[in-house]
Amino acid sequence: MDASVKTLNTEKAKALQAALAQIEKQFGKGTIMRLGEGEVIDDIEVVSTGSLGLDIALGVGGLPRGRVIEIYGPESSGKTTLTLQVIAEMQKLAGTCAFIDAEHALDSQYAQKLGVNLQELLISQPDTGEQALEIVDALVRSGSVDLIVVDSVAALTPKAELEGEMGDSLPGLQARLMSQALRKLTATIKKSNCMVIFINQIRMKIGVMFGSPETTTGGNALKFYASVRLDIRRIGSIKRGEEVIGNETKVKVVKNKVSPPFKTAEFDILFGEGVSREGEIIDLGVIAKVIDKSGAWYAYNGEKIGQGKDNSREFLRENPELAHEIENKIRESLGVALLPSIEIEVPKGTKQAAAGA
């Protein structure tokens, strides 16, 4: 009995090996592999979101490359700001980025303030949804673009809708367009290691009695094809006296195929500046017990940083070395990769000028 089972297993192994060889011959080497061979799952390449808290919540230190990402939320919640920060981070890694501005609403001056290099950014303002997705497909297939942002899915208007009358009913047209495009895109996105971020808006479903009435535009295809889905919300305002200077923002990782989902991150988005790095250092420092909070005062190593978050934020902005030191201590305690030495970041001319002065 044992001998016959062994013979059967040997025959099955030979048949499998022949099938694998045939598949590789027909479709190319690497088309099919065993998961345990090691060459299949490499370390996931990621790009920082520009927010330390969100990078930690994502579980892999940022957004994964070669994947589809969806970022959605209400109006003025920080969707475009977050994607512009991701573009800035990708450009720091010498990556090529493209922005498909279907809404025709990109503020180039604001993008520049967030650290985006406009000279290197590719931008397209397509007329129709089909044109926008054809451009995305061409850029992905080129293999030379590292990040593409589509702003937004709701603005990808099908050609038939644009050419029709104002009152025409064309149900499911945009959903079919997105479904077809994502079927074509997914495989090439993985091969080219290009990250595609779709910004999406929220709509309300009518007549929903139980559960959330909120839904995103463009049908269900994007929900399935996206490896990461981020729900971004404004939860409060940041004031300096009576003046509102920014928004308190909460991001929930609704879906995550590369790490456990449902984690959240909270950070400040300051108008004209983007995600407040110093604000995050203070908040995460208190959580990690690197910074002590007593009443309204914040202290580090027994020395007071400032009274109130706004003053503490300004102090850290004026003392980048200290901010760098605190951030690395936070990263160490939370098990995230440390930042490089600050000497690398500060230009040499600055030190010489300071010494000469």
Swiss-Prot record:
Q: Which SUPFAM superfamilies match?
A: P-loop containing nucleoside triphosphate hydrolases, RecA protein, C-terminal domain
Q: Which organism is it from?
A: Methylibium petroleiphilum (strain ATCC BAA-1232 / LMG 22953 / PM1)
User: Is ATP-binding among this UniProt entry's keywords?
Assistant: yes
Give me the residues that bind ATP, please. G73, P74, E75, S76, S77, G78, K79, T80
Q: Where in the cell is it found?
A: Cytoplasm
GO cellular component annotations of the record: cytosol
Instruction: Identify the domain of life.
Output: Bacteria
> Known SMART domains for this protein?
AAA
Tell me, in a sentence or two, what this protein's role is. Answer: Can catalyze the hydrolysis of ATP in the presence of single-stranded DNA, the ATP-dependent uptake of single-stranded DNA by duplex DNA, and the ATP-dependent hybridization of homologous single-stranded DNAs. It interacts with LexA causing its activation and leading to its autocatalytic cleavage.
Q: Which UniProt keywords apply?
A: ATP-binding, Cytoplasm, DNA damage, DNA recombination, DNA repair, DNA-binding, Nucleotide-binding, SOS response
Spell out the NCBIfam families in the cross-references: tigrfam_recA
**Could you identify this protein by its name?**
Protein RecA
